[in-house]
UniProtKB/Swiss-Prot annotation:
Binding site for GTP: D29, G30, K31, K32, F33, H34, S75, D76
Record function comment: Adds a GMP to the 5'-end of tRNA(His) after transcription and RNase P cleavage.
BP-aspect Gene Ontology terms: tRNA modification; tRNA processing
Catalyses which reaction(s): a 5'-end ribonucleotide-tRNA(His) + GTP + ATP + H2O = a 5'-end phospho-guanosine-ribonucleotide-tRNA(His) + AMP + 2 diphosphate + H(+)
Lineage: Eukaryota, Metazoa, Ecdysozoa, Arthropoda, Hexapoda
EC number: 2.7.7.79
Gene: Thg
Cofactors named for this entry: Mg(2+)
GO terms of molecular function: GTP binding; magnesium ion binding; tRNA guanylyltransferase activity
Name of the protein: Probable tRNA(His) guanylyltransferase
InterPro entries associated with the record: Thg1_C_dom (IPR025845), tRNAHis_GuaTrfase_cat (IPR024956), tRNAHis_GuaTrfase_Thg1 (IPR007537), tRNAHis_GuaTrfase_Thg1_sf (IPR038469)
GO cellular component: mitochondrion
Cofactor note (record): Binds 2 magnesium ions per subunit.
Species of origin: Drosophila melanogaster (Fruit fly)
Length: 286
């Protein structure tokens, strides 16, 4: 940039560099998503395709930022965990936050037609925040908090919408029936009145979606992809099985189901090997 007498205005900019050696988490949340989901007729209590739009948008963010070691999503929110040593955008908070939020929002729009049958009536909006965690335990507790939130909300919403859609209760009547109940009460209600064992519902609804970068075996070859998991990250077993998250970041091998999830298939079929393996470097970006 050429020097001029107006350059002094740069002195008003704030230094928002993030402290070194801390875990950086960026969480994005949908803005007025109740209205958005109603306008686009999302299935209640969970719309699998709508959740997969979120997962696909988050995958696009992880493909852009190689320093994101884990992403976790539920409902209309997603959390992105950057490794402690990241130098992306010189660790400038505003740059990281705005890039992730805008990239997620635009990717959501681009992914919409690949998953949803209805046309997009208007663009969604997401806000975001940056939170720093100094220790591994702090980070684990944060992610455990978000997954516990999934369980509480999904159990309530499943019971609520069963009462409304199948029993014909009004929203107010369903709220009154569930008021003051505990998890055991809601589980009992679902089983006794609807024949539903809550633990048999799809894991994505009960546990949210964890995105990790893994090496996918394809015959005699392999390639990296962002894969969706629906596991219990509150347990210590999760961290033992995915040691690359907190350790030296070398993606482990994907323990693939019999059929690849569509999200993985889209990555495998949509890019050539060179593009998939190309590292990303935002360290020097201002």
């Amino acid at each position: 940039m050429a020097c001029s007498r107006f350059e002094y205005v740069k002195s008003f900019e704030q230094d928002d560099s993030i402290l070194p050696n801390v875990w950086i988490v960026i969480r994005i949340d949908g803005k007025k998503f109740h209205k958005f989901s109603k306008t686009h007729d999302f299935e209640k209590p969970n719309d699998e395709n709508a959740l997969n739009v979120m997962n696909a948008a988050a995958t696009a963010v992880m493909q852009e930022f190689r320093d994101i070691v884990l992403a976790y999503g539920q409902s209309d929110e997603y959390s992105f965990v950057f490794r402690k040593e990241t130098a992306a955008f010189k660790r400038r908070s505003a740059k990281l936050l705005t890039y992730v939020t805008s990239l997620f929002s635009s990717s959501y729009v681009m992914q919409w037609s690949k998953w949803m049958n209805l046309p997009l009536a208007y663009a969604p909006c997401f806000d975001g925040r940056v939170v720093l965690y100094p220790s591994e335990q702090n980070l684990k507790d944060y992610l455990s908090w978000r997954q516990a939130d999934v369980h509480v909300n999904n159990l309530y919403n499943t019971a609520f919408w069963k009462l409304v859609l199948e029993k014909g209760l009004t929203n107010q009547q369903a709220e009154a029936k569930l008021r003051g109940t505990f998890s055991a009460d809601k589980n009992e209600l679902l089983f006794q009145e609807f024949g539903i064992n809550y633990n048999n519902l799809p894991a994505m609804y009960r546990k949210g979606t964890i995105l990790l970068r893994k090496r996918v075996i394809l015959g005699e070859k392999s390639r990296q992809a962002v894969v969706p998991l629906h596991e219990d990250l509150i347990s210590s077993q999760f961290w033992k099985e995915h040691t690359e998250i907190l350790g030296k970041y070398v993606p482990g091998t994907y323990d693939a189901p019999q059929t690849f999830p569509r999200l993985v298939e889209m990555q495998i079929n949509g890019k050539d090997d060179n593009e998939a393996e190309e590292p990303q470097n935002l360290a020097g970006t201002s």
